[in-house]
């Protein structure tokens, strides 16, 4: 397989959301390596698909338990942004690269079904652009699942609730803001949930524009992905932000494992250059996460691993790619690939090795 068609290029950072949108979001929803290694990977990927049970169909268009079973999880649009770069889409026209965390957390004072939301950009966990708290209920009159979107009065207090859910369990309604008219209504149709706001109901006054700004969200949820189309318009119907195509976010799978790097790959001057140094405790998701390889003793090797589900450009076949990158440049040194649903994947280059197993897979 030619690396011309699969090797992940260095990404140009997607255009940031403008300041007007940011204000809206805040107010509304809220030579050491040996030649024998070469550039070829010895693939040790075991294409063992996870035998996941199928969830039964919903009992109604507003089956909340079924909906939440699909909704909860983490999502990322890495392949969408990667493909746009491959296709030569101008950086300003590419979708923003966004990672979404939708974590159910019990908060009885707010509602019976509540979800902590964190969305960050460019694979940088600290680059948070939106943080919300969702509450779901069944609206019998509409025959829909109703999503109320709450902003935090103090976002910093709950910034890491996804890592420490206990901090949010006692949150009170007074610590949140909800914008009337901006609720989303979900209904199950044709094997998917479609979410939308009431037309013209969600708006705010922009002091900069000296007029109202109207928001519309259109969403599609399946068991494997969520598509999000956010748009804003002025009073004359001119679009202020948003794209024709939605952000296509796929649900991630996490993998754990290890790597080992021979010392002379990054420090050839040492007395024992043949020593293999272990990098334990790796954890990364399969939608483009990059993790630097740091040894048990804290030594930076100068290499990283990237795990990503991508599409082979010649045949349009989906693959799970495990790439070895130079940390400083993002250049791909070598990669292996497996079936996109594989439970295990690995690589052996002689001077470095790595093995990853999907969380929850049989050992």
Task: Describe the residue ranges of each PLM region.
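N-terminal secretory signal peptides that target proteins for export/translocation
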Residues: 1-33
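The N-terminal extracellular segments of secreted preproproteins, especially immediately downstream
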Residues: 4, 25-29, 51, 181, ...
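Bacterial N-terminal signal peptides
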Residues: 39-49
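Bacterial Sec-dependent signal peptides at the C-terminal "C-region" and cleavage site
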Residues: 48-59
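Calycin-type beta-barrel ligand-binding domains and close structural analogs
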Residues: 60-88, 116-363
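Short secondary-structure subsegments characteristic of cysteine-rich extracellular domains
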Residues: 93-105
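A short helix-loop-beta-strand connector motif used in the catalytic cores of GNAT acetyltransferases and
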Residues: 110-114
């Amino acid at each position: 397989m030619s690396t011309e068609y699969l090797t992940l290029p260095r990404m140009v950072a997607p255009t940031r959301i403008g300041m007007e949108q940011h204000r809206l979001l805040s107010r509304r929803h809220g030579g050491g390596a040996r030649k024998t290694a070469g550039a070829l990977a010895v693939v040790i990927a075991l294409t063992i698909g996870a035998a996941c049970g199928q969830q039964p169909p919903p009992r109604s268009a507003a089956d909340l338990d079924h909906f939440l079973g699909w909704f909860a999880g983490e999502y990322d649009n890495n392949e969408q942004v990667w493909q746009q770069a491959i296709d030569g889409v101008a950086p300003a026209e590419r979708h923003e690269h966004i990672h979404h965390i939708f974590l159910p957390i019990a908060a009885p004072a707010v509602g019976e079904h509540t979800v902590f939301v964190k969305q960050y950009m460019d694979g940088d966990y600290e680059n948070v652009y939106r943080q919300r708290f969702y509450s779901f209920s069944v609206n019998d009159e509409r025959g829909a699942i109703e999503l109320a979107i709450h902003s935090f009065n103090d976002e910093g207090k709950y910034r890491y609730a996804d890592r420490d859910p206990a901090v949010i369990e006692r949150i009170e309604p007074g610590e949140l803001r909800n914008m009337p008219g901006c609720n989303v209504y979900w209904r199950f149709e044709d094997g998917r949930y479609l979410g939308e706001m009431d037309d013209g109901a969600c708006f705010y006054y922009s002091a900069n524009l000296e007029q109202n700004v109207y928001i519309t969200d259109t969403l599609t949820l399946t068991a494997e992905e969520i598509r999000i189309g956010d748009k804003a318009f002025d009073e004359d119907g001119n679009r202020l932000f948003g794209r024709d195509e939605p952000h296509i976010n796929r649900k991630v799978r996490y993998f754990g494992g290890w790597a080992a790097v021979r010392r002379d790959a990054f420090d050839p001057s040492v007395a024992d250059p043949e020593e293999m140094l272990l990098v334990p405790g790796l954890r990364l998701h399969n939608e483009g996460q990059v993790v630097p390889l740091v040894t048990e003793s804290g030594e930076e090797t100068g290499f990283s691993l990237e795990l990503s589900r991508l599409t082979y450009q010649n045949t349009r076949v989906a693959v799970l790619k495990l790439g070895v990158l130079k940390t400083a440049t993002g250049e791909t040194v070598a990669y292996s690939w497996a079936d996109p649903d594989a439970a295990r994947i690995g690589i052996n280059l002689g001077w470095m090795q790595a093995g990853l197993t999907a969380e929850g897979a049989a050992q």
